[in-house]
Amino acid sequence: MEVKDLKPALIWQCFDEITKVPRPSRHEEQIRKFLLDFAAAHNLAAKTDAVGNVVMTKPATPGCENAPTVILQAHMDMVAEKNNDVKHDFMKDPIDTYIDGDWVKARGTTLGADNGIGMAACMAALIDKDLVHGPLECLFTVNEEIGLEGAINLGEGMITGKILINLDSEDDGEIFVGCAGGIDTTAIFHYRRSVAPEHFHFLKVSVSGLLGGHSGGDIHQGRANANKLIARFLWGLSQEHEVAVCEFNGGNLRNAIPREACAVFGIHGEAKQTVADALDAFAREIQGEFAGIEPSVKFDIESIERPAYCIDSDTSLRLIRALYSAPHGVYSMSRDLPGLVETSTNLAAVKMEEGDTIKVTTSQRSSVESRKFDIAHQVEAHFQLAGAEVSHSDGYPGWAPNMKSPIMKIAAEAYEELFDVKPAIKAIHAGLECGLFLETRPELDMVSFGPTMTGVHSPDEQLNIPTVEKFWRHLELTLAKVAKS
């Protein structure tokens, strides 16, 4: 069986088509054309704004014309992550999907169920002739994964409804009514090139096989950070030997826990075997520390040719110290909602860049606005102590829970009616676009829900098939209840 053959047919057929269209962040041209072609093929009104967001509208079911307009919202872009041994061009290749038991997966890449299944639900709602609903507006935003840019720059008048259902959540049985705000902090190290010592032996050390995951939704899992592990190993070596660091690269995305990292470094030739022994001991140490959490962590080391140059010793030492000691993970838990992470930080990526610079990207989140800035400023101070230039993104606000929300009540009643169990009403430690919509439309009544998926923002991403049917039925009944309210 293929993905397009799954039931309910409409949502799975739409999702299957979406997986064939390249749509990494900042490159939504093809998926936008796909959406506009879809609208034209089904005689749906559609419009775009200056940044490329798309809205499609559908008239109410006959007899429901006076019902309130509902906005269904999802984002177009996907996180483009792949394993190092996988050949895949996210700019032109379709996602290679397959079914494994109750799960839809992708071979060696992110699946894009975040937020492809939300897009598919919007599309299915637009063409389902049996759906009962009031006026519908389906909003597809751009560049959500790199800072919620589509929501930040949403064109005036693009949406008119006062009820919004965000379809970008990842846990069946949970209805979200709040989310964290976020801000990115970037540190730039400038270095001088120094001649690679002739009497040094040069090696490349790497770590792979980590689970990674979403820097909001998975940060509480205590998973290993590839950048931290490589920095820790190099720092340990530097306590006993002179280490000449030539390269350091790890992670890719601000909102993903880094799964892989590597460094090129030199050490006195006679210490070559010492390094191999040290890595073996370090690997055993890490496997013990993360037993039951990181079952597939793998370290590799190989000899390489002497590089043209290394990072100057002063910058090299400051960089390794800063990465090793940088904060990462959960900073504090919510005192109001048990089990909810309040504040966190993610040491997301380290990249060698042009102009003899090294760029360190971090991402901070908090459901308390002042603490969002506090943790960002702590990260700033940390890297300033290491001599880096530090800057912050504009950030985005959180979404404060409204426990008296009418749409929350309707969505909860619909779920319980269908499945004979009360859904959990929650806030999420991740950035949803809802908080940004509230800034310009404070009257909006909003919820977020979706099917179960795990491993998002990593090649381990998978979408649970049975919960997609539940998600669709939940959306159907919620829309019908709003139409009849």
Protein language model features and the residues they cover:
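A short beta-alpha structural unit
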Residues: D16-K20, V264, K298-C310, A348-V350, ...
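Acidic/His- and Gly-rich active-site-bordering loop/insert found
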Residues: E2-W103
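Active-site metal-coordination/substrate-binding segment of hydrolases
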Residues: C64-I146, A151-K162, I188, F202, ...
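Active-site-adjacent substrate-binding region
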Residues: N225-N227, R232-F248, S393-G395, P401-L444
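Acidic-enriched catalytic cores of C-N bond-cleaving enzymes acting on peptides and small amides
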Residues: G178, V195-F200, I219-N249, G269-S344, ...
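Zn-dependent metallopeptidase/amidohydrolase metal-coordination segment
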Residues: K7-I11, R335, E342-G355, S363, ...
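Fold-level recognition of mixed alpha/beta catalytic cores in primary-metabolism enzymes, strongest
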Residues: L136-A226, L234-S238
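His/Asp/Glu-rich mid-to-C-terminal helical/loop segments that flank catalytic regions of hydrolases
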Residues: G157, R223-E240, I267-K272, T315-Y324, ...
